[in-house]
A protein has these predicted regions:
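Extended ligand-binding regions for polar small-molecule ligands
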Residues: 62-70, 133-137, 141, 146-147, ...
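Short helix-initiation/N-cap motifs at beta->coil->alpha
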Residues: 78-90, 173-188
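C-terminal functional modules
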Residues: 273, 277-337
Length: 337
Protein backbone atom coordinates (compact mmCIF):
# COMPACT_ATOMS: atom_id res chain seq x y z
CA UNK A 1 0.00 0.00 0.00
CA UNK A 2 1.05 3.63 0.28
CA UNK A 3 3.51 2.76 3.03
CA UNK A 4 5.29 0.42 0.69
CA UNK A 5 6.49 3.17 -1.63
CA UNK A 6 9.20 5.56 -0.54
CA UNK A 7 8.63 9.18 -1.53
CA UNK A 8 12.23 10.05 -0.85
CA UNK A 9 13.29 7.53 -3.44
CA UNK A 10 10.84 8.98 -5.95
CA UNK A 11 12.54 12.34 -5.62
CA UNK A 12 15.92 10.73 -6.21
CA UNK A 13 14.56 9.08 -9.35
CA UNK A 14 13.27 12.41 -10.59
CA UNK A 15 16.59 14.08 -9.80
CA UNK A 16 18.47 11.45 -11.78
CA UNK A 17 16.25 12.07 -14.76
CA UNK A 18 14.88 8.56 -14.87
CA UNK A 19 11.32 9.79 -14.94
CA UNK A 20 11.88 11.23 -18.40
CA UNK A 21 13.56 8.11 -19.73
CA UNK A 22 12.03 6.71 -22.93
CA UNK A 23 9.80 3.67 -22.90
CA UNK A 24 11.55 0.33 -22.83
CA UNK A 25 9.58 -0.62 -25.97
CA UNK A 26 6.60 -2.82 -26.66
CA UNK A 27 6.04 -4.54 -23.31
CA UNK A 28 3.37 -6.90 -24.63
CA UNK A 29 5.66 -8.22 -27.36
CA UNK A 30 8.50 -8.57 -24.86
CA UNK A 31 6.30 -10.53 -22.44
CA UNK A 32 4.96 -12.78 -25.19
CA UNK A 33 8.43 -13.54 -26.54
CA UNK A 34 9.79 -14.20 -23.06
CA UNK A 35 6.91 -16.51 -22.25
CA UNK A 36 6.09 -15.15 -18.79
CA UNK A 37 5.22 -11.97 -16.91
CA UNK A 38 7.76 -10.42 -14.54
CA UNK A 39 5.77 -9.22 -11.57
CA UNK A 40 7.23 -7.43 -8.51
CA UNK A 41 5.94 -8.54 -5.13
CA UNK A 42 6.49 -7.06 -1.69
CA UNK A 43 6.73 -10.06 0.60
CA UNK A 44 4.83 -10.83 3.81
CA UNK A 45 1.87 -8.50 3.36
CA UNK A 46 -1.25 -10.46 4.41
CA UNK A 47 -4.16 -9.96 2.06
CA UNK A 48 -1.90 -8.49 -0.60
CA UNK A 49 1.07 -10.81 -0.97
CA UNK A 50 2.06 -13.75 1.19
CA UNK A 51 2.85 -17.46 1.00
CA UNK A 52 0.25 -19.86 2.35
CA UNK A 53 0.69 -23.16 4.18
CA UNK A 54 0.92 -25.01 0.86
CA UNK A 55 3.83 -22.83 -0.21
CA UNK A 56 1.74 -20.96 -2.80
CA UNK A 57 1.68 -17.22 -3.31
CA UNK A 58 -1.63 -15.53 -2.59
CA UNK A 59 -3.05 -12.05 -2.12
CA UNK A 60 -4.69 -9.24 -4.07
CA UNK A 61 -1.40 -8.08 -5.62
CA UNK A 62 -0.61 -11.66 -6.62
CA UNK A 63 -4.06 -11.98 -8.19
CA UNK A 64 -3.47 -8.81 -10.19
CA UNK A 65 -0.37 -10.39 -11.67
CA UNK A 66 -2.41 -13.50 -12.45
CA UNK A 67 -5.09 -11.39 -14.13
CA UNK A 68 -2.55 -9.93 -16.57
CA UNK A 69 -0.93 -13.31 -17.19
CA UNK A 70 -4.32 -14.92 -17.85
CA UNK A 71 -5.16 -12.18 -20.36
CA UNK A 72 -1.86 -12.54 -22.23
CA UNK A 73 -1.27 -16.30 -22.10
CA UNK A 74 -4.56 -17.90 -21.08
CA UNK A 75 -2.50 -19.43 -18.27
CA UNK A 76 -0.59 -18.39 -15.16
CA UNK A 77 2.99 -17.82 -16.28
CA UNK A 78 4.68 -15.47 -13.85
CA UNK A 79 8.14 -14.83 -12.47
CA UNK A 80 7.68 -13.09 -9.12
CA UNK A 81 10.40 -10.58 -8.35
CA UNK A 82 10.76 -9.82 -4.61
CA UNK A 83 11.13 -6.10 -4.04
CA UNK A 84 11.28 -3.56 -1.24
CA UNK A 85 9.57 -0.17 -1.02
CA UNK A 86 12.91 1.35 -1.96
CA UNK A 87 13.20 -0.54 -5.27
CA UNK A 88 9.59 -0.67 -6.49
CA UNK A 89 9.52 2.15 -9.03
CA UNK A 90 13.16 1.99 -10.09
CA UNK A 91 12.69 -1.62 -11.22
CA UNK A 92 9.62 -0.64 -13.19
CA UNK A 93 11.36 2.35 -14.76
CA UNK A 94 14.39 0.28 -15.71
CA UNK A 95 12.31 -2.41 -17.41
CA UNK A 96 13.33 -5.10 -14.91
CA UNK A 97 9.63 -5.77 -14.22
CA UNK A 98 6.63 -5.39 -16.51
CA UNK A 99 4.06 -3.81 -14.20
CA UNK A 100 3.64 -2.71 -10.61
CA UNK A 101 0.45 -4.57 -9.62
CA UNK A 102 -0.56 -2.54 -6.59
CA UNK A 103 0.53 -0.70 -3.49
CA UNK A 104 0.76 2.72 -5.10
CA UNK A 105 -1.51 5.61 -4.21
CA UNK A 106 -2.45 7.43 -7.40
CA UNK A 107 -1.24 10.95 -6.62
CA UNK A 108 -0.60 14.09 -8.65
CA UNK A 109 3.19 13.95 -8.42
CA UNK A 110 3.44 10.24 -9.18
CA UNK A 111 1.22 10.68 -12.22
CA UNK A 112 2.90 13.79 -13.61
CA UNK A 113 6.55 13.57 -12.59
CA UNK A 114 7.54 9.92 -12.45
CA UNK A 115 7.15 8.70 -16.01
CA UNK A 116 4.34 6.38 -14.90
CA UNK A 117 0.82 5.69 -16.09
CA UNK A 118 -1.79 4.47 -13.62
CA UNK A 119 -4.46 2.08 -14.79
CA UNK A 120 -7.57 2.81 -12.76
CA UNK A 121 -8.34 2.55 -9.06
CA UNK A 122 -8.68 -1.04 -7.85
CA UNK A 123 -8.82 -0.36 -4.11
CA UNK A 124 -10.05 2.62 -2.11
CA UNK A 125 -8.16 2.77 1.16
CA UNK A 126 -7.46 5.21 3.97
CA UNK A 127 -4.82 5.72 6.62
CA UNK A 128 -5.75 4.66 10.14
CA UNK A 129 -4.23 3.83 13.51
CA UNK A 130 -3.57 0.76 15.61
CA UNK A 131 -3.59 1.25 19.40
CA UNK A 132 -3.73 -0.79 22.59
CA UNK A 133 -7.17 -1.42 24.03
CA UNK A 134 -5.86 -0.78 27.54
CA UNK A 135 -4.64 2.73 26.75
CA UNK A 136 -6.26 6.15 26.86
CA UNK A 137 -6.69 6.43 23.09
CA UNK A 138 -10.17 5.66 21.79
CA UNK A 139 -10.46 8.06 18.85
CA UNK A 140 -8.19 9.90 16.44
CA UNK A 141 -8.71 13.07 18.49
CA UNK A 142 -7.16 11.28 21.49
CA UNK A 143 -3.86 11.03 19.57
CA UNK A 144 -3.04 14.64 20.48
CA UNK A 145 0.39 14.48 22.11
CA UNK A 146 0.94 10.82 21.15
CA UNK A 147 4.07 9.10 19.88
CA UNK A 148 3.30 7.41 16.56
CA UNK A 149 5.27 4.76 14.66
CA UNK A 150 5.26 5.38 10.91
CA UNK A 151 7.17 4.20 7.84
CA UNK A 152 9.78 6.79 6.88
CA UNK A 153 9.61 8.64 3.58
CA UNK A 154 6.10 7.48 2.70
CA UNK A 155 2.82 9.18 1.93
CA UNK A 156 1.77 7.97 5.39
CA UNK A 157 4.38 10.19 7.02
CA UNK A 158 3.27 13.15 4.93
CA UNK A 159 -0.42 12.50 5.66
CA UNK A 160 0.35 12.38 9.37
CA UNK A 161 2.05 15.76 9.31
CA UNK A 162 -0.70 17.32 7.19
CA UNK A 163 -3.54 16.02 9.38
CA UNK A 164 -2.03 16.97 12.72
CA UNK A 165 -1.08 20.42 11.46
CA UNK A 166 -4.58 21.04 10.09
CA UNK A 167 -6.18 19.95 13.37
CA UNK A 168 -3.63 21.74 15.56
CA UNK A 169 -2.64 18.54 17.26
CA UNK A 170 0.79 17.61 18.55
CA UNK A 171 2.58 14.31 17.97
CA UNK A 172 6.03 12.79 17.82
CA UNK A 173 6.86 10.51 14.91
CA UNK A 174 9.11 7.48 15.39
CA UNK A 175 10.15 6.49 11.87
CA UNK A 176 11.31 3.17 10.46
CA UNK A 177 12.45 1.88 7.10
CA UNK A 178 9.69 -0.69 6.79
CA UNK A 179 6.38 -1.76 8.28
CA UNK A 180 7.78 -4.77 10.13
CA UNK A 181 10.21 -2.67 12.17
CA UNK A 182 7.50 -0.16 12.92
CA UNK A 183 5.20 -2.88 14.25
CA UNK A 184 8.03 -4.36 16.31
CA UNK A 185 8.64 -0.95 17.87
CA UNK A 186 4.93 -0.52 18.57
CA UNK A 187 4.77 -3.89 20.31
CA UNK A 188 7.85 -2.93 22.32
CA UNK A 189 5.95 0.13 23.64
CA UNK A 190 8.17 2.60 21.82
CA UNK A 191 5.08 4.40 20.54
CA UNK A 192 1.45 4.89 21.50
CA UNK A 193 0.08 4.09 18.05
CA UNK A 194 1.08 2.55 14.74
CA UNK A 195 -0.21 4.07 11.52
CA UNK A 196 -0.72 2.53 8.11
CA UNK A 197 -3.55 1.96 5.68
CA UNK A 198 -6.45 0.24 7.40
CA UNK A 199 -6.41 -2.65 4.93
CA UNK A 200 -2.77 -3.34 5.72
CA UNK A 201 -3.26 -2.96 9.48
CA UNK A 202 -6.17 -5.41 9.37
CA UNK A 203 -3.99 -7.97 7.62
CA UNK A 204 -1.14 -7.60 10.07
CA UNK A 205 -3.20 -7.42 13.25
CA UNK A 206 -3.36 -11.20 13.54
CA UNK A 207 0.43 -11.40 13.41
CA UNK A 208 0.84 -9.52 16.69
CA UNK A 209 1.84 -11.46 19.80
CA UNK A 210 -1.53 -10.78 21.47
CA UNK A 211 -3.82 -9.43 18.74
CA UNK A 212 -6.81 -9.34 21.07
CA UNK A 213 -5.09 -6.59 23.07
CA UNK A 214 -5.14 -4.14 20.16
CA UNK A 215 -7.75 -2.31 18.11
CA UNK A 216 -8.00 -0.16 15.00
CA UNK A 217 -9.39 3.29 15.73
CA UNK A 218 -12.56 4.31 13.88
CA UNK A 219 -12.04 6.69 10.98
CA UNK A 220 -9.19 7.54 8.61
CA UNK A 221 -7.08 10.63 7.98
CA UNK A 222 -6.50 10.28 4.24
CA UNK A 223 -7.85 9.02 0.94
CA UNK A 224 -5.64 6.44 -0.77
CA UNK A 225 -6.85 5.45 -4.25
CA UNK A 226 -4.67 2.45 -5.07
CA UNK A 227 -3.82 1.64 -8.67
CA UNK A 228 -1.44 -0.48 -10.70
CA UNK A 229 1.28 1.37 -12.60
CA UNK A 230 3.07 0.84 -15.91
CA UNK A 231 5.81 2.72 -17.71
CA UNK A 232 4.69 5.80 -19.60
CA UNK A 233 4.97 5.73 -23.38
CA UNK A 234 3.57 2.24 -23.99
CA UNK A 235 -0.15 2.82 -24.68
CA UNK A 236 -0.95 -0.73 -25.82
CA UNK A 237 0.39 -2.21 -22.56
CA UNK A 238 -1.39 0.44 -20.51
CA UNK A 239 -4.66 -0.38 -22.29
CA UNK A 240 -4.17 -4.10 -21.69
CA UNK A 241 -3.57 -3.67 -17.95
CA UNK A 242 -6.37 -1.12 -17.57
CA UNK A 243 -8.98 -3.23 -19.39
CA UNK A 244 -7.88 -6.44 -17.69
CA UNK A 245 -8.64 -4.87 -14.30
CA UNK A 246 -11.90 -3.47 -15.68
CA UNK A 247 -12.85 -6.96 -16.83
CA UNK A 248 -12.94 -8.31 -13.27
CA UNK A 249 -15.17 -5.43 -12.15
CA UNK A 250 -17.43 -5.73 -15.20
CA UNK A 251 -17.76 -9.46 -14.57
CA UNK A 252 -19.08 -8.81 -11.06
CA UNK A 253 -21.47 -6.16 -12.38
CA UNK A 254 -22.79 -8.67 -14.93
CA UNK A 255 -23.09 -11.52 -12.43
CA UNK A 256 -20.26 -13.51 -14.04
CA UNK A 257 -18.04 -15.34 -11.55
CA UNK A 258 -15.32 -17.95 -11.59
CA UNK A 259 -17.96 -20.53 -10.69
CA UNK A 260 -20.44 -19.75 -13.48
CA UNK A 261 -18.36 -18.25 -16.30
CA UNK A 262 -18.74 -21.29 -18.57
CA UNK A 263 -22.51 -21.33 -18.16
CA UNK A 264 -22.77 -17.55 -18.63
CA UNK A 265 -20.71 -17.77 -21.79
CA UNK A 266 -23.30 -20.13 -23.25
CA UNK A 267 -26.53 -18.69 -21.89
CA UNK A 268 -26.17 -14.98 -21.06
CA UNK A 269 -28.48 -12.76 -23.07
CA UNK A 270 -26.49 -9.63 -22.19
CA UNK A 271 -24.75 -8.12 -25.21
CA UNK A 272 -22.04 -6.65 -22.97
CA UNK A 273 -21.45 -10.03 -21.32
CA UNK A 274 -21.13 -11.66 -24.74
CA UNK A 275 -18.61 -9.04 -25.83
CA UNK A 276 -16.69 -9.43 -22.57
CA UNK A 277 -16.51 -13.21 -22.86
CA UNK A 278 -15.55 -13.18 -26.54
CA UNK A 279 -18.77 -14.71 -27.86
CA UNK A 280 -18.77 -12.08 -30.59
CA UNK A 281 -16.81 -9.01 -31.54
CA UNK A 282 -13.05 -8.61 -31.82
CA UNK A 283 -12.24 -6.85 -28.57
CA UNK A 284 -9.26 -9.09 -27.87
CA UNK A 285 -7.62 -8.22 -31.18
CA UNK A 286 -7.77 -4.53 -30.29
CA UNK A 287 -5.51 -5.33 -27.31
CA UNK A 288 -3.26 -7.70 -29.24
CA UNK A 289 -4.83 -10.69 -27.48
CA UNK A 290 -7.04 -13.66 -28.26
CA UNK A 291 -10.76 -13.02 -28.14
CA UNK A 292 -11.19 -15.13 -24.98
CA UNK A 293 -8.77 -12.98 -22.95
CA UNK A 294 -11.41 -11.78 -20.45
CA UNK A 295 -12.97 -15.24 -20.24
CA UNK A 296 -9.54 -16.59 -19.30
CA UNK A 297 -9.17 -13.93 -16.59
CA UNK A 298 -12.48 -14.82 -14.97
CA UNK A 299 -12.00 -18.56 -15.39
CA UNK A 300 -8.50 -18.59 -13.89
CA UNK A 301 -8.67 -15.74 -11.33
CA UNK A 302 -12.31 -14.75 -10.86
CA UNK A 303 -14.22 -11.49 -10.73
CA UNK A 304 -13.52 -8.70 -8.25
CA UNK A 305 -15.64 -10.22 -5.49
CA UNK A 306 -14.07 -13.65 -6.00
CA UNK A 307 -10.67 -12.08 -5.41
CA UNK A 308 -11.83 -9.96 -2.48
CA UNK A 309 -13.40 -12.87 -0.63
CA UNK A 310 -10.39 -15.09 -1.27
CA UNK A 311 -7.84 -12.56 -0.05
CA UNK A 312 -9.61 -10.24 2.40
CA UNK A 313 -12.54 -12.40 3.48
CA UNK A 314 -10.46 -14.44 5.96
CA UNK A 315 -9.28 -11.15 7.50
CA UNK A 316 -12.85 -10.00 8.12
CA UNK A 317 -12.30 -6.87 6.03
CA UNK A 318 -15.52 -5.21 4.90
CA UNK A 319 -15.58 -4.02 1.29
CA UNK A 320 -16.92 -0.59 2.22
CA UNK A 321 -16.14 1.86 -0.58
CA UNK A 322 -14.88 -1.09 -2.63
CA UNK A 323 -18.41 -2.32 -3.23
CA UNK A 324 -19.91 -1.91 -6.68
CA UNK A 325 -21.55 1.44 -7.40
CA UNK A 326 -24.90 -0.38 -7.49
CA UNK A 327 -24.31 -1.49 -3.89
CA UNK A 328 -23.38 1.98 -2.64
CA UNK A 329 -19.64 1.70 -3.30
CA UNK A 330 -17.25 3.43 -5.69
CA UNK A 331 -16.28 0.59 -8.03
CA UNK A 332 -17.54 0.91 -11.59
CA UNK A 333 -16.23 -0.69 -14.75
CA UNK A 334 -15.73 1.30 -17.91
CA UNK A 335 -18.27 0.06 -20.48
CA UNK A 336 -17.32 -2.80 -22.80
CA UNK A 337 -18.87 -1.33 -25.94
Amino acid sequence: MAARLNLGLLCVVIALGLASAPSCGDTLSDVQKRGYLRCPIIEASPGFSSINAAGEREGMDVDHCKVISAAVFGAIKIEYVPITPQTAFTLLQSGAVDVFPGGASWTFLRDTAMGLDFTGVYLYAGQGFLVRKSGRIHSIADLDGATICVAQGTTLEQNLADYFRAHRMRYRAVTFGNIERGLDAYQADRCDAFTNEVTSITGRLRELVNPQDHKILPGVISREPMAAAVRQGDPRWRDLVLWSFNAVIAAEELGISQANVDEMRKTSGSAEAQRLLGVYGDYGAKLGLSNDWAYNIIKLVGNYNDQWQRNFGPLGLDRGANRLWSDGGLLMSLPFR
